[in-house]
Swiss-Prot record:
GO terms for biological process: fructose 1,6-bisphosphate metabolic process; gluconeogenesis; glycerol metabolic process; reductive pentose-phosphate cycle. GO terms for cellular component: cytosol. It comes from the Bacteria. This is D-fructose 1,6-bisphosphatase class 2/sedoheptulose 1,7-bisphosphatase 2. It comes from Acaryochloris marina (strain MBIC 11017). Homotetramer.
Amino acid sequence: MDNVIGLEIIEVVEQAAIASARWMGKGEKDTADHVAVEAMRDRMNKIHMRGRIVIGEGERDDAPMLYIGEELGICTQPDAAQVCNPDELLEIDIAVDPCEGTNLVAYGQNGSMAVLAISEKGGLFAAPDFYMKKLAAPPAAKGKVDINKSATENLQILAQCLDRSIEELVVVVMKRERHNDLIKEIREAGARVALITDGDVSAALSCAFSGTNIHALMGIGAAPEGVISAAAMRALGGHFQGQLIYDPDIVKTGLIGESKESNLARLKEMGISDPDKVYTAEELACGETVLFAACGITPGTLMKGVRFFGGGARTQSLVISTQSKTARFVDTVHMFETPKRPKALQLH
């Protein structure tokens, strides 16, 4: 799968990022997201595959494109029998976030990117639109920190694993009221807190790379993004755990239902028998081969944002593979058209 589709998924996130970046700073987050969705969907439909969205823009009734269950790729089209050999058919599950951090794009802030993860059919956990408690940490701490431990305990373990003092650690937490106690505990333990308003996939990803000055992600964010983060962290060998949050009182507001009971019933309908289960990266992205790709929309910790010039743009992307055990940064120059040159000044 890596050799067949690796370059193409880079182009998918690049096209989404370029489309969204045109709306950077214009205050229209829905438009920035919509154009990214369109660009991502259009490019995926040109890939020789039968793909199925398992994490997308929402349920079919709520999302016109990239909805959960939508099929994409050349081999899903009416004339597929003429161009797709059943013996060589590439069937994959896809998790997407065409514009992670729509507010960041709308207000010209750092940290937004277009992301996706793919695996063979059944290789990605189809997370509901719930919240998820998350813990991400570098490869050195894999299996040593634990989401069931307190933040203080995990910081002590993390400091030991990274051979540094707690005071030298930086923990990313989303700036939400529900995290006030967590933020207080982290600070009292001696670590530093980097607050973000959106974009915890980028934060989780940064934990796995040395030199980013991000050592952990803690707190509660959206579950679908948790699966995408897990795909990247599995490929990078980093630590990731996630636990679904079904009690609305914990998050106060957001994507989950009106009552704890209705959410538990929904999870049961989805076949999730243990709602309190703590999932590892290997369980959330369980496929034999998992690929993750991202492209910066606005500048971030790992990637530069889209930079436009006359007749083109330059992007920086990242593709990670469990198959090749690589993380490749890709710098691409896109030529749109020949820029129009101004007419020579006529002097009389």
